[in-house]
């Protein structure tokens, strides 16, 4: 699925990948590759929430863009709208359905049956490896622009924070930290960079209160 503002005639799918949770395109101008790529979360039915598999794909695409010498700009966005209610989202953070005590799980969440839990590979236990993608965004020598067509919540809000620039829909964009709602805290780059950008007290207000902010208020 691709979003309404996305014009397929101006982009081509980047070869060599078989992504299921994201889409990865290269901008095309007059039939030739341009130095911009578009990486989009592609789970609009769950507000583009990410699971470990999603983050693995995101990291691969980001790293490919990082090492592609004629790419200078990365657009990070979310496809939509949701097929169920028509709501737009950039990313709603981690998929809470698969969250365990040790992080987000590749396979079965806590509470699954014994037979299902025996399938869990210890090497693929719960983890918070979205932090690895955040670090790659911060330190890659390319401009990363977050394009927010709707909700940027929780870990999705943190991703927008760590990008170099953010372009948001005046009509649909909504920003919110959900830590207080789900009982977790972003101890990675998202919280640290937000405090550097807007100040310690306002950053704490955003994290502690979990209030919703429009694009105009966020600006």
Can you say where each PLM-predicted feature lies in the sequence?
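Conserved CoA-thioester-binding segment of acyl-CoA-metabolizing enzymes
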Residues: 1-84
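Glycine- (often His-adjacent) and acidic-residue-rich active-site loop
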Residues: 46, 78-131, 183
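Crotonase-fold acyl-CoA enzyme core
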Residues: 135-219
């Amino acid at each position: 699925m691709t979003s309404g503002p996305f014009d397929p005639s101006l982009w081509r799918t980047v070869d060599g990948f078989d992504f299921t949770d994201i889409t990865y395109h290269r901008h095309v101008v007059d039939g030739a590759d341009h130095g911009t790529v578009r990486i989009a979360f592609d789970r609009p039915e769950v507000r583009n929430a990410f699971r470990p598999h999603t983050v693995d794909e995101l990291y691969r695409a980001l790293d490919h863009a990082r090492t592609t010498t004629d790419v200078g700009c990365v657009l990070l966005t979310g496809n939509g709208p949701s097929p169920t209610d028509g709501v737009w989202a950039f990313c709603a953070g981690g998929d809470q359905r698969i969250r365990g005590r040790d992080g987000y799980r590749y396979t079965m969440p806590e509470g699954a049956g014994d037979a299902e839990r025996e399938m869990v590979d210890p090497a693929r236990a719960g983890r918070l490896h979205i932090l690895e993608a955040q670090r790659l965004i911060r330190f890659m020598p390319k401009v990363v622009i977050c394009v927010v067509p709707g909700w940027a919540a929780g870990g999705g809000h943190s991703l927008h924070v760590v990008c170099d620039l953010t372009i948001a829909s005046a009509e649909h964009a909504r920003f919110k930290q959900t830590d207080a709602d789900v009982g977790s805290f972003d101890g990675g780059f998202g919280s640290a960079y937000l405090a550097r950008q807007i100040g310690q007290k306002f950053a704490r207000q955003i994290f502690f209160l979990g209030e919703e902010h429009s694009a105009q208020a966020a600006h």
